[in-house]
Swiss-Prot record:
Function statement: Together with LptE, is involved in the assembly of lipopolysaccharide (LPS) at the surface of the outer membrane.
Record localization: Cell outer membrane
One Pfam assignment: LptD
Signal peptide coordinates: 1-20
Record flagged with keyword Lipoprotein: no
Similarity remark: Belongs to the LptD family.
Cellular component terms per the entry's GO annotation: cell outer membrane; transporter complex
InterPro entries for the chain: LipoPS_assembly_LptD (IPR020889), LptD (IPR050218), LptD_C (IPR007543), OstA-like_N (IPR005653)
Listed name of the protein: LPS-assembly protein LptD
Organism of derivation: Chromohalobacter salexigens (strain ATCC BAA-138 / DSM 3043 / CIP 106854 / NCIMB 13768 / 1H11)
Length: 821
């Protein structure tokens, strides 16, 4: 897609209806506005607040009773009563203030000479001449200024009427949440009706003005005046990019308190007209959403990807659907449904509405129910997902689990003994319709013939059982845990038309034995003028798993685990259940921690550990126990399988102060005297909203570059990552990120943004440039640079323009907490 710009329709119709001059502004104090002065709370964006004063007269003893207070009272013509001199008239919860008030002879209407003030609960109206019914709710104020205190809404009108049904009608009126004296924005309409009981307003010939400049016009508009949901048009989004003009006009439907919908027609000059929508619902403990979009015939668009033709999808329909539901049958039994699908792997690249959506790489399909008891946990699911690669290679198609049934339990005795039952039965399936009987298929990008390995060619069922027995003693000075587990896997496989002599019913039974132990030593010490409690925690771990032939086993969900601190203390070399790696190792290490003596808070932890192997690791992804990786063709895999010791792993986590924290990791191969992997991170996090992250990572043979496929051992991966968020003022935030791949001399991501947030409005402007890799090939020569600009306007109390992307910014900048408008 690329270079997509979301912004408000500031270039909308510059239409302004003829209208009378608005009333002259009033001083802020006459609108119940009180400045904060020295009492402003932290982070206050407004210079003050509206404070509603109490009534000057108490209510009458009976409904509709009228009470008055004035300097003088006299009879006028025709039996009318004339009150003068700071007149206050109250009937029920309505109070009228004026210098002179005339009550007609029928005593059912009062007429006041300006300046006047009419108060209702939560509402103040000031203006010129006014009249009000004494036997009903109707009232009228000329040249009115009004304030709705709780919603921080104010405005003016040539004439304001309170109708008998309690609604308010305003002629040539305005509406804003900006504080008095601030004319940043206001909504203006020739005929405005406010319904406080329902929480919305309507306006004809409405226009949005910024300053005194009209920037958008609506013949008719419905808008909220509080936080309640209302049906009506939402703010449009208008974008310009390499794909041309992109306009979306959403319409919100508040169908019921527990379900609603949004329709979003979208017109794109280079693609055509798309209809999108979303439906949300909540019924008791069940809730869900369904959203989607459909484009009947794509005009072709324009792609920033040099590997894709611009007309790749010309005349084709483009669509997506995403359904999510979560519910609960009982406190222990819940369920979840999800179904996502898109017409093609580039849908979100072309039509993603924000940065996060453009990065969507898969869509989940799931039906699951789970029971969580005190002992047993039962789970039944059917699960898969659509992988959004374009084109999608045959060997990258994911397996579906149709179904997957799990039953797990744990029993624990006071003596420290425990028993576990872990079981899973799953049927794995995927459609390899483009593969011939030899397992070969044609790569759409290169035209080359490729072959799917036999271990990935079968569909079938797997029964996996791992019961375990253990004992754990955990006194205050350490722990000891011997554990024995039985690993059992059996398969029923179907290779379809693939020619093979592999066993279609392979099985495996093997023990997994381990012994974990540790000691905890403590001492009191003093450093840097402070008292500390230091611990020394040596740990010793032994694991044994015999080798078993798994050369006929499939690969449904398995990958080799990366070396890590946690991996030192685990008997498993693979994820999933299709491979059980042989291991005979002893892991040893120690940790020391420094804790504040008075609070017990950990300020520093340092850990060092390593594993020693007593035999080679013969089982790899091929599963053959009789062969090792070829030393000449794949030296690194051979070395990892035959090395006597793991790298020495060092980890440091140092909370330098309340605001500064650092983390460091180092993987050092003492046999070759080389660093295999290293990373360092430094973070500053100020409660005032300032965040700084500095990161560095280096990895030997992190991946294989496209232009240097032969030089595997000498290839390294080096990255720099800098990100920040700076709150310059309570109203102004700056954010940024720079992720740099030093190996290939390219920026992986650049992000720069500014956010302005004041009393009545907010603006987010973010620019992003990133490397797009839309397939799973482990190369870089097909990557390309994409970029986008995100612009969001929020008119507080009225609505906003642009998609919310705060979640993405928080992920890109660890520690950053975006302001929610």
């Amino acid at each position: 897609m690329g270079k997509r710009l979301f912004w408000t329709a500031l270039s909308g119709l510059m239409v302004s209806a003829a209208h009378a001059a608005p009333p002259a502004p009033l001083p802020a104090q006459q609108l119940d506005w009180q400045p904060w002065g020295d009492q402003a709370p932290n982070g206050a964006l407004c210079s003050g607040r509206y404070v509603e004063p109490g009534y000057r007269l108490s209510a009458g003893d009976t409904p509709r009773q009228v009470r008055t207070d004035s300097a003088t009272a006299a009879y006028g013509d025709g039996g009318a009563t004339v009150l003068a001199g700071e007149v206050v008239l109250r009937r029920d919860d309505t109070q009228l203030e004026a210098p002179r008030v005339r009550v007609n002879a029928e005593r059912d209407r009062a007429f006041a000479e300006g300046p006047t003030a009419v108060r209702y609960p939560g509402l103040l109206v000031r203006g010129g001449d006014a009249s009000m019914a004494l036997d009903g709710d109707a009232a009228q104020v000329d040249n009115a200024h009004y304030v709705i205190h709780e919603q921080r809404v104010r405005g003016d009108a040539i004439e304001l009427q309170r109708l008998p049904d309690g609604r308010y009608r305003l002629d040539d009126a305005s509406f804003t949440t900006c504080e008095p004296g601030n004319r940043l924005w206001r909504m203006v309409g020739s005929d405005v009706t406010l319904d406080r009981a329902e929480g919305f307003g309507t306006a004809t010939h409405a226009r949005l003005e910024m300053g005194d400049v009209p920037v958008f016009y609506w013949p008719w508009l419905r808008f909220p005046i509080d936080d309640r949901r209302q049906s009506g048009f939402l703010w449009p989004t208008l974008g310009f990019s390499g794909d041309g003009l992109d306009y979306t006009q959403p319409y919100y439907l508040n169908l019921a308190p527990n379900y609603d919908a949004t329709l979003s027609p979208r017109w794109m000059s280079e693609h055509g007209t798309m209809l999108g929508g979303e439906f949300r619902y909540l019924f008791g403990s069940d809730q869900g959403t369904i959203e989607g979009a459909y484009l009947a015939s794509d005009k072709g668009g324009a792609s920033d990807n040099p590997n894709d033709p611009d007309d790749a999808f010309e005349d084709e329909s483009r669509w997506y659907i995403d359904y999510r539901h979560a519910g609960r049958f009982s406190p222990r039994l819940d369920y979840q449904l999800a179904y996502g699908a898109a017409s093609d792997g580039r849908y979100f690249d072309d039509f993603g509405r924000d940065f996060a959506e453009q990065d969507t790489d898969h869509l989940l399909r799931l039906a699951r129910t789970t029971y969580r008891g005190d002992t047993w946990r039962l789970d039944a699911r059917a699960q898969g997902y659509q992988k959004l690669d374009y084109p999608l290679d045959e060997d990258d198609k994911p397996f579906y689990r149709l179904p997957s049934l799990s039953a797990d339990a744990r029993w624990r005795q006071d003596s420290g003994f425990y028993q576990e039952w872990n079981s899973n039965a799953t049927y794995f399936w995927r459609d390899l319709h483009g593969v011939d009987s030899q397992g070969r298929w044609t790569d759409e990008e290169t035209g080359n013939r490729r072959t799917i390995p036999l271990r990935e060619a079968a569909n079938g069922s797997r029964l996996h059982l791992t019961p375990a027995l253990g004992w754990r003693a955990e006194p205050s000075w350490g722990f000891l845990e011997p554990r024995a587990q039985l690993w059992q896997s059996s398969y029923q496989l179907d290779y379809g038309n693939r020619q093979t002599d592999r066993d279609e019913n392979p099985s495996l039974v093997a023990p997994v034995l381990s012994m974990d132990s540790g000691l905890i030593f403590e001492r009191d010490t003093s450093l840097f003028g402070s008292d500390w409690r230091q611990t020394l925690e040596p740990r010793l771990y032994y694991a044994y798993v015999p080798e078993r032939d798994q050369s006929d086993f499939p690969d449904f969900d398995t990958s080799e685990r990366a070396v890590s601190w946690g991996q030192l203390w685990s008997p498993y070399r693979f994820t999933g259940a299709d491979r059980l790696g042989d291991v005979n190792k002893l892991s040893y290490g120690a940790s020391t921690r420094f804790l504040e003596d008075d609070t017990g808070r950990e300020r520093l932890s340092l850990s060092v550990g390593q594993s020693s192997y007593f035999s080679d690791r013969n089982i790899d992804m091929n599963g053959d126990p009789d062969t090792l990786p070829n030393k000449e063709r794949n030296y690194q895999d051979w070395y990892n399988a035959t090395r006597d010791r793991s790298p020495v792993i060092t980890q440091l986590d140092w909370r330098i102060s309340e605001r500064w924290r650092s983390r460091y990791a180092w993987f050092y191969d003492a046999d070759r005297s080389v660093t295999e992997k290293a990373s360092a991170y430094l973070q500053y996090n100020d409660p005032a909203g300032h965040v700084l992250n500095l990161g560095y990572s280096w990895q030997l043979e992190g991946f294989e570059p496209a232009d240097d496929a032969e030089d595997r051992l000498g290839y390294n991966r080096e990255d720099y990552d800098v990100s920040f968020a700076y709150q310059a003022t309570p109203s102004l935030d700056l954010i940024g990120r720079f992720l740099y791949d030093n190996t290939n001399d390219r920026a992986m991501e650049q992000l720069a943004g500014v956010q302005f947030n004041d009393c009545c409005s907010a603006v987010q402007l973010v620019w992003r440039e990133w490397i797009e890799d839309n397939d799973t090939a482990n190369t870089i020569d097909d990557d390309y640079t994409d970029r986008g600009v995100f612009l969001r306007f929020v008119f507080k109390g009225l609505g906003g323009v642009g998609q919310e992307a705060d979640t993405y910014f928080e992920e890109a900048i660890p520690g950053y907490r975006a302001t929610r408008f």
